Amino acid sequence: MLAIAALVVVVAATFAVARPGEAPPAAADALQAKALGELRVFTGWLDRFGAEGYIGEVGWPDDARGDGSEWNRLASMWYDEADRARLWVTAWATGSLFGSTYRLNLYDHDGRGLVPSTQAVVVERAAPRGVHRGVAVAGGEFGTQAPSFSNEFPGTYGADYRFDPPETFSYLARRGHRLVRLPFRWERIQPQLGAPLDPLELGRLRSAVAGARAAGLSVVLDLHNFGAYRTPGGPLRLGAEISAETFADTWRLLAEAMKDTPGIVGYGLMNEPTHVQAGQAGTPERAWELASQAAVTAIRSTGERRLVMVGGYPWSSVHDWPSHHPRPWITDPRRNLRYEAHHYWDRDHSGTYPATYDDELAAAERR
């Protein structure tokens, strides 16, 4: 841990952060230029239409391969750019169920408490006034890799999945965070489509929100389902087996259940709706636009006024956002909406980072 702490200090001391009003620093290499250019695709789209944005996920590797300072230098420039665009950001990720080998884990749980990874020095930097910064606290969406996972076999709470305890949120607040994104699964919160929500799972979600709020954190609830709902017979997909009306009704129930729960700043309609099908809409993009509009309308019908985050088909990626959604598509009577994009800097934008910084740089130079 001493080596990690030393690296954090060195990296923090060497970053040159542009203050508001200053010109952005020029990219020093091709990978920095590529990442910043991709982010500007999304922020340019927002600017063109007067829309507001939220980066629900951004993540990069730790120093396990000895290149943490290079990744952090890119990250610092990326956050400068996000600050100038006044983007809300939750970095990916932390959570007590992550193993110590997960290279995007921002805070390791070492058995005695949480320990910052090398990325934390960038993520913890102060945001401009009125801009929310924080992290995703994963765990509520875990346990879905087993072939048997479904609405009928959702896993065991505390073993296969769980929300982090209040101590995690208190620690994050002490580190300067003000926002957390809480993923959860549709199959657990609503074990049968069109049926009431599960009161036990609702209670767990409310308890997690209460723990975050007690620490002074605001919460974005994140339905982490990729545009599908798992059953023993296979996935049901939005646009095909699941109608926009069914999806909207789920969000009506969620908004009714949570609208009096303090601490929630917004609702994330669907994490990376990549499994959405075209159906009668003609294209999966249009099917998602119709489903997400129906969900926003349903949420507002309950009297809920809080923010709604709307991702883009298929992976909510910044670099190709306009090619899937040339224009904003949501009409919100409350005008309290942010379009949610994600950004990973490896060449396939998967966030798996199998290559080193130097390898990714070489790939960027060949573009």
How should each PLM-predicted stretch be described?
Residues 1-18:
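Secretory targeting and sorting signals
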Residues 15-21, 25-28, 34-45, 109-179:
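N-terminal carbohydrate-binding accessory modules
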Residues 22-85, 107-108, 153, 157, ...:
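Extracellular glycoside hydrolase catalytic/binding regions
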Residues 53, 89, 219-221:
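Hydrophobic beta-strand scaffold residues
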Residues 59-63, 94-99, 138-143, 179, ...:
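Solvent-exposed loop/turn segments at secondary-structure junctions
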Residues 64-130:
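Aromatic-rich peripheral "rim/lid" segments of glycoside hydrolase catalytic domains that contact
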Residues 87, 133, 178-180, 265, ...:
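Short acidic/polar active-site loop segments enriched in Thr and Asp
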Residues 153, 157-179, 184, 190, ...:
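An active-site-proximal structural segment forming one wall of the substrate-binding cleft
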